[in-house]
Amino acid sequence: MAAAVAAAAAMRSRILQVSSKVNATWYPASSFSSSSVPTVKLFIDGKFVESKSDKWIDIHNPATNEVVGRVPQSTKAEMDAAVESCKRAFPAWADTSILSRQQVLLRYQQLIKENLKEIARLITLEQGKTLADAEGDVFRGLQVVEHACSVTSLMLGETMPSITKDMDLYSYRLPLGVCAGIAPFNFPAMIPLWMFPMAMVCGNTFLMKPSERVPGATMLLAKLLQDSGAPDGTLNIIHGQHDAVNFICDHPDIKAISFVGSNQAGEYIFERGSRNGKRVQANMGAKNHGVVMPDANKENTLNQLVGAAFGAAGQRCMALSTAILVGEAKKWLPELVDRAKNLRVNAGDQPGADLGPLITPQAKERVCNLIDSGTKEGASILLDGRRIKVKGYENGNFVGPTIISNVKPSMTCYKEEIFGPVLVVLETETLDEAIKIVNDNPYGNGTAIFTTNGATARKYAHMVDVGQVGVNVPIPVPLPMFSFTGSRSSFRGDTNFYGKQGIQFYTQLKTITSQWKEEDATLSSPAVVMPTMGR
C-alpha cells in the first residue's frame, strides 16, 4: 500500500513539473485528489473550457499504465460551437493582411522554441517516447512553422499581361474557409504542426482533433498560439473518437480535412469526406524497405538500420521496418543483431533510454501476435523482445527490439504494418529482385538504399515506385520546403502535406481576366459575337 501511494505521489509530482502553462490549461494542480485525475479542456473561441460530456476516456502513461488524465468525448453542441467559432472568425482572419498573419507565425515559432522541452516532457508522459525523441518530434513540427513564415513567397499568384490588346490575365490564391485536422498518437506535436499553422497562415480558420491518447501537446501548442496573437476562434480544439471524426467528415461548413493515421481510418475519412464535397489529404500506413548493397559502408549502414527500425519503438509511419540484404550483405546479419541487442529499453523519461514503450497494452498484444505469426509461418526469430522486463516499470507496454529473418513476401509479418520495434529481413541475390519486392508491396511511403555506387543509387531511385527515397538516408522525410510525398496505398488525395503542396491544399485559385481599353472605356457599340480572346 505504501509503495502504491509513493508511486502515485511521484507521478503527480512529475505531472506538476511539466509546465506552468500546462497546469493552467490541462493539468491544473487543484484537480489532484486521491479520487480524481486532471481533465483535458476543450479550446473554443479562445477559451479553455470544461466539457459537459458524460463520456470520458482515460489517458495512460504507457510506461506504467497509470491514468494521468481524462479526455472528453465532445458533445454535439460543443463541436457545433467550435465550428461556429471558426466560421465567425474566418472573414476577419482571411481579410487580415498576409504580413500580419506572418507576424503571428513568427512569434509562434519563437514561443515553441522557448517551450520545446516542456512540450517534449508532456509528450513523453502521454506517448512514452524518449525525451530526446520527443524533442525531435517538436523540432520537426517547428520546421514546418518556420517554413509557413515564408507565406509571402509561397502564396504568390501568376500573371500574364497583354494576352490580347488591353487585356491582362492574373490569378491569386485565397483561403478555403474552415479546415479541420485529425491527428494520430505517434507524433503529438509534429503532425498538428503540419496542419493548423500552414492552414492558418493562408487565411483559413482551423478545427483540430488531436488523438484522444495524447492531447496534451496540442493543448499547450494552442496556448502558445494564443500568446502569439492569433485571434479568438481562428483555432478551436475538440476531442473524441468516432463521433468526432464523423462530425468533421459531415459538417457542411468544413471545407477541407487533413488526416494522418491508419489505413482503415484514412480510407474511411477520405471516402466519407470526399462524398460530402470536402478536399481531403490522408497520410496512412507504410511498409518501408531498406535495401542494403554489399558495397555499402557497413558501420554506417548497420547503425542507421538499427536506429530507423527501433527508434520511437517503431511507432513511425516512416520507420524502416523491412531490410532487404542483397548478395554478400546477408553476412552482416549477426552484427545487425548485436547492435540491436545493445539498445536500452526504458521509460522515456529515464536517462539513457533508446526506446520506450508502445502506446497501449492492445498495441503490445498486436505486435507480439505478429511476431508469433512469423514463427508459425517459417521465419526465424534472431532477436526476441516479447518477454522483456523493465525494472521499475513492470506494468508498461514494453517490447524490445526484435529481428525476424528468413522472411518471405507472403508472410503475415511482412504484409502487415507492424508498428512496433520489429525489423523483418529478406534476402535477394540482385538489386532487380529487391526492386521487384519493393514495387510489389502496396505501400509507397518511403524507402532507402545503402550503397557507395552512384549508378546503383540512381537506378534504384528511378525504378522504385515509392514517393520518398533515401540514398544512405534511412528515414527520408523531406524538409518542409519540399512536400511529404508518400504515394500508392500510403496516401489518399491529390495534394500532399506542407511545402508548396501544403499551400495548394489550403488555398483555392481565383483567376481574373481584366480589360482596360487604351482609348475611351465607353464602347461605341455592343459586341454580340463570341469573344475569341487571342484573335
Curated annotation (Swiss-Prot):
The lineage of its organism: Eukaryota, Metazoa, Chordata, Craniata, Vertebrata. NAD(+) binds at residues 183, 185, 209, 212-213, 262, 417. This is Methylmalonate-semialdehyde/malonate-semialdehyde dehydrogenase [acylating], mitochondrial. Acetylation of Lys-55; Lys-117 and Lys-331 is observed in liver mitochondria from fasted mice but not from fed mice. The gene is Aldh6a1. One of its GO terms (biological process) is valine catabolic process. PANTHER family: MALONATE-SEMIALDEHYDE DEHYDROGENASE (PTHR43866), METHYLMALONATE-SEMIALDEHYDE DEHYDROGENASE [ACYLATING], MITOCHONDRIAL (PTHR43866:SF3). The active site is at 317 (nucleophile). It is found in: Mitochondrion. It comes from Mus musculus. GO terms for molecular function: malonate-semialdehyde dehydrogenase (acetylating) activity; methylmalonate-semialdehyde dehydrogenase (acylating, NAD) activity. Belongs to the aldehyde dehydrogenase family. The modification N6-acetyllysine is found at residues 47, 52, 55, 76, 87, 117, 129, 298, 330-331, 364, 376, 500. The keyword Mitochondrion applies. It catalyses: 3-oxopropanoate + NAD(+) + CoA + H2O = hydrogencarbonate + acetyl-CoA + NADH + H(+); 2-methyl-3-oxopropanoate + NAD(+) + CoA + H2O = propanoyl-CoA + hydrogencarbonate + NADH + H(+); (R)-2-methyl-3-oxopropanoate + NAD(+) + CoA + H2O = propanoyl-CoA + hydrogencarbonate + NADH + H(+); (S)-2-methyl-3-oxopropanoate + NAD(+) + CoA + H2O = propanoyl-CoA + hydrogencarbonate + NADH + H(+). The modification Phosphoserine is found at residues 262, 380. Homotetramer. The modification N6-succinyllysine is found at residues 47, 52, 55, 76, 117, 129, 364, 376, 391, 517.
